[in-house]
Amino acid sequence: MWIRLGLVTGLAALVAASSSAGAQVLSEKNISIKMALVIAETALTECTPRVSVAVLDRAGRLRVFLQGDGASPHNLELARRKAYTALTFRRTSADWAKRTAEGDLTGQRSLADVIPLGGGVPIMIGEEAIGSIGLSGAPGGQSQEEACAKAGIAKVQDQLK
């Protein structure tokens, strides 16, 4: 009986020690409000005053939203969803739209808050998405929105390390 109790106690101590050894605090990079503002303002300036710009943090929370003069009301939601799509899949929303147009990946289009439209770009440090930007309402369409989003990110590229 004492042997069994000793074995059980020893095994419990071993499990507890191995569990706590693997537990540690995570260190994650995220987009700051200052960086989000610079990206959004640059994208708006590069594009047209009629666009809406949404910048999200790594968790998909809205950090900055700019609605240009004369922007349509629905562009707010479109910009946010484009940014969310880019963040979630760590690729431009236009690239994701192409990848999910046919085949096994089409089911991804039914996920909440994603949208198969161009204009969303992830903000990356290496392979890690720390945020994203989405634009909607550019007169040149989705390719212009993506170019403006990339210009916003380029403004802070030296800080993305």
What residues fall within each predicted segment?
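N-terminal secretory signal peptides that target proteins for export/translocation
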Residues: 1-3
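Bacterial N-terminal signal peptides
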Residues: 6-18
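Flexible, solvent-exposed loop/hinge segments and secondary-structure transition points
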Residues: 21-161
